[in-house]
Regions:
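Surface-exposed helix-capping loop/turn segments at secondary-structure junctions
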Residues: 17-23, 83-92
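Hydrophobic/aromatic-rich alpha-helical bundle segments in the mid-to-C-terminal region
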Residues: 62-72, 85-130, 134-146
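Amphipathic alpha-helical packing segments from all-alpha helical-bundle domains
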Residues: 9-12, 27-31, 42-45, 61-85, ...
Length: 152
């Protein structure tokens, strides 16, 4: 657990350091994505694999799986804060951060399993779509007809 907390502190520090430096939404999202990719390379793996660690340990060590899950949720909340800091409407920050964070985790996991960079390039396309879309279009995608958030 101590090693997980060390990773968490390191990533949170780097996560927060990107926020004030990059102004546009696209630059910010690409920097966040690059942070996860670079952490994977630093761990000598093809992707930052806290998600896979949580999956692999869920039955053997629920405590480790829960810690991984808590760390990932904390990082997702940092992403939501970063979206808000870039003037994304507040009602869109959580659903978009949930969708994007889940997509990033999936792409990194798929890249690691299949050893195929295409999964990582899909995230860059997703970032471009989020960056170029109007708030109205994003609301259409990320909210239900009765204005409730879609749960990712």
């Amino acid at each position: 657990l101590e090693a997980l907390e060390k990773i968490n502190c390191n990533v949170k520090k780097e996560f927060k350091s990107i926020s004030p430096k990059l102004g546009t939404l696209e630059e910010y999202l690409l920097a966040v994505f690059d942070l996860f990719i670079s952490k994977g390379k630093a761990c000598k793996r093809s992707g930052f694999s806290l998600t896979l660690l949580a999956m692999e340990t869920s039955e053997l060590s629920p405590l480790i799986a829960e810690k991984c899950s808590d760390i990932l949720e904390n990082w997702r909340l940092l992403l939501a804060d970063g979206l808000y800091d870039r003037n994304l409407p507040e009602d869109l920050c959580n659903p978009i951060s949930e969708w994007l964070f889940t997509s990033i985790q999936g792409a990194i996991s798929a890249n690691r399993i299949h050893k195929d960079e295409a999964f990582l390039y899909n995230i860059k396309s997703t970032i471009k779509i989020i960056s170029l879309a109007s708030p109205e279009f994003l609301r259409e995608i990320f909210t239900k007809g009765n204005e409730e958030e879609i749960v990712a």
